[in-house]
């Protein structure tokens, strides 16, 4: 879908660039596949702010998305493509031949009326799901499982994809968007194609209020605060903070490595931090 630009009849429209969603379904989602969603405002169960700069925003209902795709060898037809406020990708409503309805992540080049199916030996076409062991090497995929049966976790955001680049002793070798290459079990399911809405990265909100509509509040810099609020705060006039960047709690940030998950290091064949040759 194309991008929309606007004549600058207001200041907020001068820089505004949004995705044209005119081809998406304009009605309400399927009620049986939705659930109420309450605002947390960045608070946890004790009422303390655990994520700063969140709150407000337009009311949403949560759409249940089928990330597992374990309804095997049952053909489904794409009824419509829909907008989902809870994610950057578009979603597709699928009606299976037995009458069941489900939402899946819509890949690029999936259209209303197309048929999708999940199984161990199905065609390699956008929207179909199958184990990595059944896919030809070189396939572009999304919604990739890390553990068989857990549901897709990798490449679910708008425009993202992974590529199957090889196999090794029952494991599949994937190249991710970040440049990382990692091993995943060949029994893990993945869907064919790249995720829809690739223009998402080109949008420009045009005004601060558009972020507020999404539930994002102003992100205040530490150097603009008082010393009581942040290690970078205070000083006479504008300052640079006077120290290497730290969080409000004094921990180094902006480039400080924080990964300490040694349990999965053995699955990473090439780090995303290695220089791309």
Swiss-Prot record:
SUPFAM superfamilies in the cross-refs: Nucleic acid-binding proteins, Translation proteins SH3-like domain
Annotated stretches, region: Disordered: 222-277
Keyword Ribonucleoprotein: yes
Annotated Gene3D superfamilies: 2.30.30.30, Nucleic acid-binding proteins, Ribosomal protein L2, domain 3
Keywords assigned: Ribonucleoprotein, Ribosomal protein, RNA-binding, rRNA-binding
Alphabetized GO MF terms: rRNA binding; structural constituent of ribosome; transferase activity
Listed GO biological process terms: cytoplasmic translation
Residues annotated as transmembrane: none
UniProt family annotation: Belongs to the universal ribosomal protein uL2 family.
Known partners and oligomeric status: Part of the 50S ribosomal subunit. Forms a bridge to the 30S subunit in the 70S ribosome.
Biological role: One of the primary rRNA binding proteins. Required for association of the 30S and 50S subunits to form the 70S ribosome, for tRNA binding and peptide bond formation. It has been suggested to have peptidyltransferase activity; this is somewhat controversial. Makes several contacts with the 16S rRNA in the 70S ribosome.
HAMAP family per the UniProt record, alphabetical: Ribosomal_uL2_B
Protein name: Large ribosomal subunit protein uL2
Species this chain originates from: Brucella melitensis biotype 1 (strain ATCC 23456 / CCUG 17765 / NCTC 10094 / 16M)
């Amino acid at each position: 879908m194309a991008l929309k630009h606007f004549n600058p009849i207001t200041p907020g429209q001068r820089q505004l660039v949004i995705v044209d969603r005119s081809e998406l379904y304009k009605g309400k989602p399927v009620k049986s596949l939705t659930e109420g969603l309450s605002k947390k405002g960045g608070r946890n169960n004790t009422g303390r702010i655990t994520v700063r700069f969140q709150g407000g925003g337009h009311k949403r209902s949560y759409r249940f998305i089928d990330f597992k795709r374990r309804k095997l060898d049952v053909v489904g037809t794409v009824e419509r493509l829909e907008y989902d406020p809870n994610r950057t990708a578009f979603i597709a409503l699928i009606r299976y031949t037995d009458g069941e309805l489900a939402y899946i992540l819509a890949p690029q080049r999936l259209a209303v009326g197309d048929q999708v199916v999940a199984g161990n030996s199905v065609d390699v076409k956008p929207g179909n799901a199958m184990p990595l062991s059944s896919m030809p090497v070189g396939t572009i995929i999304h919604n990739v499982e890390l553990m068989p049966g857990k549901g897709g976790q990798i490449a679910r955001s708008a425009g993202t994809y992974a590529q199957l680049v090889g196999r090794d002793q029952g494991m599949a070798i994937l190249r991710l968007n970040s440049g990382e290459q990692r091993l995943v079990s060949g029994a893990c399911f993945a869907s064919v194609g790249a995720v829809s809405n690739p223009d998402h990265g080109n949008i420009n909100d045009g005004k601060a209020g558009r972020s507020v509509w999404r539930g994002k509040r102003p992100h205040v810099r530490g150097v603009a605060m008082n010393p009581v609020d942040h290690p970078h705060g205070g000083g006479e006039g504008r300052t640079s903070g006077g120290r290497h960047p730290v969080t409000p709690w004094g921990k180094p940030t902006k480039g400080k490595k924080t990964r300490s998950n040694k349990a999965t290091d053995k699955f990473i064949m090439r780090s995303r931090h290695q220089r791309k040759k």
